[in-house]
Swiss-Prot record:
The keyword Nucleotidyltransferase does not apply. It holds the Pfam family eIF-1a. Belongs to the IF-1 family. HAMAP family: IF_1 (MF_00075). The gene is infA2. This is Translation initiation factor IF-1 2. Keywords: Cytoplasm, Initiation factor, Protein biosynthesis, RNA-binding, rRNA-binding. The keyword DNA-binding does not apply. One of the essential components for the initiation of protein synthesis. Stabilizes the binding of IF-2 and IF-3 on the 30S subunit to which N-formylmethionyl-tRNA(fMet) subsequently binds. Helps modulate mRNA selection, yielding the 30S pre-initiation complex (PIC). Upon addition of the 50S ribosomal subunit IF-1, IF-2 and IF-3 are released leaving the mature 70S translation initiation complex. It is found in: Cytoplasm.
Length: 86
């Protein structure tokens, strides 16, 4: 059985929920719950409320999705922020 194609969508993070889940409002107004993809977790990419994200949604369940990319907002500048070393 072939793997089904996932729907690529963009949305805005409304709320951060427990267990690495997020409440997302898509550009078309639909709301869903999404979790972070493995690559996003692995690279420790922080997602905050108000961030614009790309996500994949299964055609079988349109109420759940997986965040695959966080879009960078050009308005924020981190040039003045001190460098923090772990």
């Amino acid at each position: 059985m072939a793997k089904e194609e996932l729907l690529e969508m963009e949305g805005l993070v409304d709320e951060i929920l427990p267990d690495s889940r997020y409440r997302i409002t898509l550009d078309n107004g639909h709301k869903l719950i999404a979790y972070t993809a493995g690559r996003v977790k692995k690279n420790h990419i922080r997602i905050l409320a108000g961030d614009k994200v790309s996500l994949e949604v299964s055609p079988y369940d349109l109420s759940k999705g997986r965040i695959t990319f966080r879009h960078i907002d050009k308005k924020q500048s981190f040039a003045g922020a001190p460098y923090r070393r772990h």
